[in-house]
C-alpha cells in the first residue's frame, strides 16, 4: 500500500457523518451516481454496499487504484449486492473530464470543490458536471463556509492525532493549525512515522481550502446553467466540522 493511500485513509477514511445523506440522495434521484473526489472510496464503497452503481472520479491514480482493488471481486460485501460491478473508477481531474455518459446525481463530498483553485477552477468543474447530468439531474456539493481557527503551540490544546499501524510501521497524523487568509483556509497536519526499528520521520502537510459560501456557489452554478434547488447540512461533531450541502439542478 502506497504512502499516499495510507495517509488518505488515516486522514479522510473514517469520516462517516455524511454517508447517510449521500445514500438518501441516491435513493431519491437514482443511480448511477458520479462521486467526484472519490479518494480511496469512503463514499463510493458505502453507496455500492447499499446497492447503488457509482462512477468514482479522482485525480490521484494511486488512490483510484486502491479504490479499484477494494471494489473488485475480493470485496465480498459488494459482491453479495450484485454480480455486476457496481463501482467504475476514473482517474481524471474534476476540472476537465469527459466520461461519455450522463448521471441523475453527482456528489462532491468533503469540501472537494474548495480544492479546485478558486473561481476559475470551480467554473471549469461546474461546466463539466453540467454536461454529465441528465436534464433535471442533481449536483450536491459539500462546502465549509467557516472553520474554527486554532494553532497548536508546544503541543498545548492539540486535537488527538489519527493513528494507524501498517506492516509494523506506526503512522500518526496530528492536526496542528487551521489558519485563515483572504483566499480561504489553510489546514496543517504533522505526519509522523515510526518503524519497528525506531526510525522516525516527521513532515508537515498543508491543504488550502478556497473561501466559498453557499450563496456564491449558487450564483456560480446559475452562470453555468444550474438552478438552486435547496440546501442541507451535515452537523458538526466533537471531532469534525460540519458542512453546508448545496443542491443544484441541471
Q: Language-model segments: what does each one mean?
A:
Residues 1-31:
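Conserved class I S-adenosyl-L-methionine
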Residues 37-39:
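Class I SAM-dependent methyltransferase "Motif I" SAM/SAH-binding loop
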Residues 42:
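Conserved SAM/SAH-binding loop-helix junction
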Residues 95-105:
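A short acidic, Gly/Pro-enriched loop at the edge of an enzyme's catalytic core
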Residues 140-215:
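SAM-dependent methyltransferase
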Residues 123-135:
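A short glycine-rich, Lys/Arg-flanked "PGG" loop and its adjoining helix->strand segment in the class I
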Residues 45-96:
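Class I SAM-dependent methyltransferase SAM/SAH-binding core
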Residues 208-250:
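C-terminal lobe and adjacent flexible extensions of AdoMet/dcAdoMet transferase-like proteins
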Amino acid at each position: 500500500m502506497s504512502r499516499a493511500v495510507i495517509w488518505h485513509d488515516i486522514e479522510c477514511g473514517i469520516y462517516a457523518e455524511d454517508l447517510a445523506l449521500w445514500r438518501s440522495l441516491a435513493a431519491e434521484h437514482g443511480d448511477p451516481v458520479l462521486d467526484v473526489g472519490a479518494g480511496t472510496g469512503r463514499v463510493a464503497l458505502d453507496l455500492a454496499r447499499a446497492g447503488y452503481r457509482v462512477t468514482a472520479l479522482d485525480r490521484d491514480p494511486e488512490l483510484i487504484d486502491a479504490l479499484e482493488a477494494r471494489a473488485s471481486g475480493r470485496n465480498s460485501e459488494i459482491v453479495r449486492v450484485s454480480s455486476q460491478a457496481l463501482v467504475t473508477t476514473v482517474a481524471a481531474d474534476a476540472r476537465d473530464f469527459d466520461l461519455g455518459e450522463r448521471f441523475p446525481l453527482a456528489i462532491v463530498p468533503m469540501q472537494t470543490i474548495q480544492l479546485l483553485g478558486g473561481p476559475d477552477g470551480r467554473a471549469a468543474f461546474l461546466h463539466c458536471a453540467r454536461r454529465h447530468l441528465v436534464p433535471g439531474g442533481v449536483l450536491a456539493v459539500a462546502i465549509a463556509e467557516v472553520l474554527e481557527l486554532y494553532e497548536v503551540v508546544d503541543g498545548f490544546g492539540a486535537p488527538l492525532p489519527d493513528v494507524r499501524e501498517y506492516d509494523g510501521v506506526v503512522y500518526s497524523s496530528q492536526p496542528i493549525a487551521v489558519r485563515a487568509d483572504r483566499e480561504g483556509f489553510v489546514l496543517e497536519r504533522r505526519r509522523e512515522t515510526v518503524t519497528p526499528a525506531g526510525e522516525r520521520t516527521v513532515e508537515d502537510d498543508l491543504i488550502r481550502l478556497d473561501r466559498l459560501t453557499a450563496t456564491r456557489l449558487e450564483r456560480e452554478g446559475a452562470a453555468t446553467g444550474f438552478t438552486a434547488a435547496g440546501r442541507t447540512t451535515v452537523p458538526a461533531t466533537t471531532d469534525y466540522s460540519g458542512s453546508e450541502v448545496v443542491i443544484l439542478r441541471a
